Amino acid sequence: MVSHPCTADEAKPPSEGQLARFENGKLIVPDNLIVAYFKGDGIGPEIVESAKKVLDAAVDKAYGGTRRIVWWEVTAGEEAQKECGSLLPDGTLQAFKLARVNLKGPLTTPVGGGFRSLNVTLRMVLDLYSNVRPVKWYGQPTPHCHPENIDWVIFRENTEDVYAGIEWPFDSPEAQKIRDFLKKEFGIELTPDTGIGIKPISKWRTQRHVRRAMEWAIRNGYKHVTIMHKGNIMKYTEGAFRQWAYDLILSEFRDYVVTEEEVNTKYGGKAPEGKIIVNDRIADNMLQQIITRPGEYNVIVTPNLNGDYISDEANALVGGIGMAAGLDMGDGIAVAEPVHGSAPKYAGKNVINPTAEILSGMYLLSDFVGWPEVKLLVEYAVKQAIAHKQVTYDLAREMGGVTPISTTEYTDVLVDYIRHADLKALKGQ
């Protein structure tokens, strides 16, 4: 049995690898990169092991042994509670801070008062302010008529908005104080049965988030960046989010972008070659647009609540959460995690689809670490497996007439496709 660090002092990285460093705003990545991870709850151990095997195969294929991952196992969730007396031990948090490059399995937050979401706690402690949800179609069954046009990356702000948790029940002393304050100072009278919630959105947190979205768009050659907001109604929060986003983009990324208004007024409706079109959409319209005009959007940058809505809708359009990758990023630190939960009823049955965990780790290595060949190989393998109907039960039942394979068999299929892939040809596509 692996002994995990429970306290911060016990968090000692593996001697055979090296830690990534963050210097002068840039991540410095060694060739023998330490990646900290924990398996989590429920199906977590199965899908994390699957992801590790696939990612190891992709790194080995891409770099021929000149680069490798040194895995550093820590613990969280039910296992951690038994071993360390804490669902999220200080040793795990310290390991994630040290490693900077991290992979996690899903966690279960116990039902009942006094337990905050472990995922939210992790994001807050590590200041993972951008939740990144790439949404692509790999050939899986989908309700969308033209899934080939779907290539979105949703950037959801992670720390503010109504998710900040600044709220009180209607019958609390705090809510009464706020109602009294609003009445006395502003003449706003709320009935005694009114609960109170506060929606904070700040310039600094908005702009650091938008900066990450722009960097992603530039790095991946995307043609559109869209600011999603409800600023027509919430003018001083979401309206401010829109304005601060434009201000940041036009001051720091002016050479890379052209606004939609400029395209229409200066360039006859056609963007100059090599420029990213920046526009904004009202949230309710945006939720329709990704269904009706999917090819017109790439990177979508949003406040917290809107990002929650649109990312779940978007993933439903390409086959659901079994394929839904996620990446939480801050300054020089990231944690890859699937969108789905721990699904305890499927734990240990070797039937679950590990693709979301695999893709999450793929984006961690390709877009945060800077090893883009990993993405070419993993995406190729996933597409091949789906095209040949070598899939787990969730996709097999949607395809109809397909015999599902197990989690471990699916993992082996992906590894085999990676090992036999023509990387040179993939780079030329």
Swiss-Prot record:
It catalyses: D-threo-isocitrate + NADP(+) = 2-oxoglutarate + CO2 + NADPH. InterPro entries: IsoCit/isopropylmalate_DH_CS (IPR019818), Isocitrate_DH_NADP_dimer_prok (IPR004439), IsoPropMal-DH-like_dom (IPR024084). Keywords: Glyoxylate bypass, Magnesium, Manganese, Metal-binding, NADP, Oxidoreductase, Tricarboxylic acid cycle. It is an enzyme of class 1 (oxidoreductase). PROSITE patterns: IDH_IMDH. It comes from the Archaea. Its EC number is 1.1.1.42. Mg(2+) binds at residue 308. Disulfide bonds: none annotated. GO terms for molecular function: isocitrate dehydrogenase (NADP+) activity; magnesium ion binding; NAD binding. Optimum temperature is 70-80 degrees Celsius. Thermostable. Its cofactor is Mg(2+); Mn(2+). The record marks 163, 230 as: Critical for catalysis. D-threo-isocitrate binds at residues 117, 119, 123, 133, 156. NADP(+) binds at residues 108, 340-346, 353, 393, 397. Homodimer. Catalyzes the oxidative decarboxylation of isocitrate to 2-oxoglutarate and carbon dioxide with the concomitant reduction of NADP(+). Belongs to the isocitrate and isopropylmalate dehydrogenases family. PANTHER family: ISOCITRATE DEHYDROGENASE [NADP]. This is Isocitrate dehydrogenase [NADP]. It comes from Caldococcus noboribetus. The gene is icd.
